[in-house]
């Protein structure tokens, strides 16, 4: 897809010190939040609307005001946002998404969080990455949203990784297709935070190895390449990544070439099956259906297979 007409080059980061002083001004009144939520739900007519698809999915009660404090172009079709979240009680688990309420837009967006819970704890910031489509919330993000734009967010989702200190150590295999990388990047970043805790010899969850399989049409649509490679280089004994492109038409640059192959194969996934491994899959429905079925056929317990489809 073509990129949006207006993009903000480079990530514009908000300062940590500004968070506390600005938080009060970001809060919406309860009546405003209620009106925003109910109006958006009632006016949404799409059969494939986020609110309809996720109507039975658990959500937190907190609807928090948030302000856009940073934006960047992650690919020709994906724009990332940093949101300063006002409510101090707002929290999420790695892998979850937010209902995204936009003043003046009747349709509620649904976007996976791609940052780690630690970033929210430290800076009161969450990060989203939104693909350009004709869906009203995505159009707003790409064409209308600016720094200091105000929205409201609420956490939901049953696809997450939230181990407790006493839990048994697990390996993770993350399988991402396209923008399905978003919740898996949140999980990967959370895993890296857990590894840093281990390195500092703190008490906490002892995570095993993490393998990311990431597929996109071309290298230009492989999001967060530098972030992912930085984590691989920081934890070479623990984190590994293989990237896959299915419709590449240009030459792959030298830095990425060692990490790039064709489509993800069943054998590659099968080689990582063990009783200590959890599988997280996020991508287009045909992809998630294929890999979850293949894992079941290879006798991976259903409770070890977590998947989420993006539309």
Curated annotation (Swiss-Prot):
Signal peptide range in chain numbering: 1-17
> Could you tell me which residue ranges the FAD-binding FR-type domain spans?
50-186
Binding-site list for NAD(+): 178-183
Q: Which InterPro entries match?
A: FAD-bd_FR_type, FNR_nucleotide-bd, Oxidoreductase_NAD-binding, OxRdtase_FAD/NAD-bd, Riboflavin_synthase-like_b-brl
Q: What class of enzyme is it?
A: oxidoreductase
* Annotated GO MF terms: oxidoreductase activity
Pfam families xref list: NAD_binding_1 (PF00175)
One GO cellular component term: mitochondrion
Gene3D superfamilies per the UniProt record, alphabetical: Nucleotide-binding domain of ferredoxin-NADP reductase (FNR) module, Translation factors
Query: What is the E.C. number?
Result: 1.-.-.-
Q: Which UniProt keywords apply?
A: NAD, Oxidoreductase, Signal
Would you tell me the protein name for this molecule? Oxidoreductase NAD-binding domain-containing protein 1
């Amino acid at each position: 897809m073509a990129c949006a007409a207006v993009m903000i080059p480079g990530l514009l980061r908000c300062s940590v010190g500004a968070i506390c002083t600005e938080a009060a001004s970001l809060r919406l009144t309860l009546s405003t939040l209620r009106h925003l939520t109910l109006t958006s739900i009632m006016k949404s007519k799409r059969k494939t609307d986020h609110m309809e698809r996720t109507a039975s999915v658990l959500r937190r009660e907190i609807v928090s005001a948030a302000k856009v404090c940073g934006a960047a172009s992650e690919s020709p079709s994906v724009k990332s946002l940093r949101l300063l979240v006002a409510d101090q009680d707002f929290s999420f688990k790695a892998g979850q998404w937010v209902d995204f309420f936009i003043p003046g837009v009747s349709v509620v967006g649904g976007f996976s969080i791609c940052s780690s819970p630690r970033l929210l704890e430290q800076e009161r910031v969450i990060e989203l990455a939104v693909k350009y489509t004709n869906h009203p919330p995505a159009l707003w993000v790409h064409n209308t949203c600016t720094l200091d734009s105000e929205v409201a967010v609420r956490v939901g989702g049953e696809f997450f990784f939230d181990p407790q200190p006493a839990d048994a150590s697990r390996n993770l295999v993350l399988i991402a297709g396209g923008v399905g990388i978003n919740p898996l990047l949140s999980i990967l970043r959370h895993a890296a935070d857990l590894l840093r805790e281990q390195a500092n010899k703190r008490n906490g969850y002892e995570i095993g190895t993490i393998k990311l399989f990431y597929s996109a049409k071309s290298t230009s649509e492989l999001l967060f390449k530098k972030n992912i490679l930085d984590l691989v280089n920081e934890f070479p004994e623990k984190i590994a990544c293989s990237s896959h492109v299915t419709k590449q038409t240009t030459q792959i640059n030298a830095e990425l070439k060692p990490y790039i192959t064709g489509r993800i194969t069943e054998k590659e996934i099968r080689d990582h099956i063990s009783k200590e491994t959890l599988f997280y899959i996020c991508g287009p429905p045909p992809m998630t259906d294929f890999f979850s079925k293949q894992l079941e056929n290879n006798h991976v317990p259903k409770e070890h297979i977590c998947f989420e489809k993006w539309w």
